[in-house]
Amino acid sequence: MSPQTETKASVEFKAGVKDYKLTYYTPEYETLDTDILAAFRVSPQPGVPPEEAGAAVAAESSTGTWTTVWTDGLTNLDRYKGRCYHIEPVAGEENQYICYVAYPLDLFEEGSVTNMFTSIVGNVFGFKALRALRLEDLRIPVAYVKTFQGPPHGIQVERDKLNKYGRPLLGCTIKPKLGLSAKNYGRAVYECLRGGLDFTKDDENVNSQPFMRWRDRFLFCAEALYKAQAETGEIKGHYLNATAGTCEDMMKRAVFARELGVPIVMHDYLTGGFTANTTLSHYCRDNGLLLHIHRAMHAVIDRQKNHGMHFRVLAKALRLSGGDHIHSGTVVGKLEGERDITLGFVDLLRDDYTEKDRSRGIYFTQSWVSTPGVLPVASGGIHVWHMPALTEIFGDDSVLQFGGGTLGHPWGNAPGAVANRVALEACVQARNEGRDLAREGNTIIREATKWSPELAAACEVWKEIKFEFPAMDTV
C-alpha cells in the first residue's frame, strides 16, 4: 500500500457499520423541484424504529450499502444520496408508515424507466430489516419528464386519425384467447368490426404459437379490418400484439404491421419490459402507429396492499415509456378496482396536471408539461348493463372493451357488437340530453331495447350477472 493511500485511509475512513438514520434520515430537508419524490409504505421488522427503516430504504435505493466503505470519500455523498425527509403512520394499520424519500435527479439516466426502477424498486425490496415495502406513488419532476418522448401520439391525435369524437371508443378481445386458427380468428375480427366496434384486440397471451403464427394472424386480421371499413365507412383497428421473445422479433412484427397499413399494434409492457416498450413506442411515433398497452403481470406487483408497487406508479411509468392505451380496470367488472382509486390513476394517465389528493391515493402533485395523454381501457367482465356506469365513470376519453360481452351474444359476434354500439350511443345521447346515467342507467338501456332486438337479447342473457367482491385496493 502506498503512503498516500495509507494517509487517506487513516485520516478519513473509519470502518464499521453505522445506523442508516445518521446519514439518510434528514427531516429538515427541503425538497427541490428537480428531486424525484417517492412515497413508500414501510412495515419494519419488530424492534426497528421507523426512522431507521425509512433511512434504510433511502440508503439502499441510492448510495448506501450495509457497511461504511472507504470509497465514500471519493465523492460527495450529500449531493447524490437519497433522503428520507418525512414519516407518518398509516391510519388504522399497526406498525406501518408512509416514508417519503427524495432522490437527486443526477442518480438517473435520462429517458430510462428501466434505470429509474432499478434504483427505486430494486434490491431494497428484499431488505431483511423490513417485513414489507410498497411504493405507493412517485413525483416525476418536470426536468425528468422532458427527457422522455412519452406516448407515441396521445388522445387528440388518435381521435383525429380515427375521425371519432364525442364518445368512448368500443373494443372487443377475441375469444377464445387461444386455439383459433388464423382464418377463424380473422372471421371473428371482421364480424365484430362490421357490427359497430371501433377496435378488436389480440389477447395478451397471443404471440406466435403453433396453432396460429403471428404473420398469418396479421394478414387475416388486416383483411378483416379493411373489409369492415369498406362496408361501414368507419376507420377500424385491430390491436396486433407485437410482443415477442426478443426485441428483434418484436420490431419485425411492428414493421410488418406498418407495411400492412394497419393503424395500431399492441405490447405487453410488463412482461415485455420497459426497454422493449420504449423502443417500440419510439418506432410507433416515427411510423404513424398507435400503441395499445396491456398490463399482464401487474397484479403480481400491485395487488398486495403492503408490498410491491401500486398501479398508479406503473401507470406513470407507462406514460413516460410510451403507450396510447392502457388497461386500467373497470370498477364494475370482474377485475380489481375501487372507484376513487381507479379514477385517481386514470386522471394521472389523461390529464396534463393532477393535484395531490390523498382521498384518491395521489400523494404528489404531478405536472406532465404537455406530454400526450393515455386512453384508459376498461376491460374485464363487462356487458351492456354496465354501459351507463362505464360511460359515467370514464367519460369520453376511454376505450370500453367487451370480450365475452360481445362474443357471448346468443345470436353471434356481429349482433353482440351491434348491442354494445347501440347501448353506448343511447348512453351518450342520454348524457348529452342532461339525464343522470348513474340513476337512470337501467331505464335508458331498457328504452333502447325497443329499437334494437340485438340489445334486447343481450340484456336478457346478462341480466343476472354481477361480480360483487370487496376491493383490495383502498386508501
UniProtKB/Swiss-Prot annotation:
GO CC field: chloroplast
Cofactor binding annotation: Binds 1 Mg(2+) ion per subunit. Ca(2+) can substitute but is not catalytically competent.
Domain of life: Eukaryota
GO MF entry, a single one: magnesium ion binding
Residues recorded with modification N-acetylproline: P3
Keywords: Acetylation, Calvin cycle, Carbon dioxide fixation, Chloroplast, Disulfide bond, Lyase, Magnesium, Metal-binding, Monooxygenase, Oxidoreductase, Photorespiration, Photosynthesis, Plastid
UniProt modified residues of type N6-carboxylysine: K201
Substrates-to-products reaction catalysed: 2 (2R)-3-phosphoglycerate + 2 H(+) = D-ribulose 1,5-bisphosphate + CO2 + H2O; D-ribulose 1,5-bisphosphate + O2 = 2-phosphoglycolate + (2R)-3-phosphoglycerate + 2 H(+)
Any single GO BP term: photorespiration
Keyword Disulfide bond: yes
Ligand binding (substrate): T65, N123, T173, K177, E204, H294, R295, H327, K334, S379, G381, G403, G404
Listed SUPFAM superfamilies: RuBisCo, C-terminal domain, RuBisCO, large subunit, small (N-terminal) domain
The protein's enzyme class: lyase
Cofactor: Mg(2+)
Keyword Oxidoreductase included in the entry's annotation: yes
E.C. number: 4.1.1.39
Active site: K175 (proton acceptor), H294 (proton acceptor)
Site residues (Transition state stabilizer), renumbered to this chain: K334
Activity regulation annotation text: Abscisic acid (ABA) causes weak inhibition of RuBisCO catalytic activity, but more potent inhibition of RuBisCO activation.
List of residues binding Mg(2+): K201, D203, E204
Record PANTHER family: RIBULOSE BISPHOSPHATE CARBOXYLASE, RIBULOSE BISPHOSPHATE CARBOXYLASE LARGE CHAIN
Biological role: RuBisCO catalyzes two reactions: the carboxylation of D-ribulose 1,5-bisphosphate, the primary event in carbon dioxide fixation, as well as the oxidative fragmentation of the pentose substrate in the photorespiration process. Both reactions occur simultaneously and in competition at the same active site. Binds to abscisic acid (ABA) which has weakly inhibits carboxylation and more strongly inhibits enzyme activation.
Subunit structure: Heterohexadecamer of 8 large chains and 8 small chains.
Family: Belongs to the RuBisCO large chain family. Type I subfamily.
Name of the protein described by the UniProt record: Ribulose bisphosphate carboxylase large chain
Source species: Spinacia oleracea (Spinach)
Lineage, broadest ranks: Eukaryota, Viridiplantae, Streptophyta, Embryophyta, Tracheophyta
Gene name, Swiss-Prot/TrEMBL: rbcL
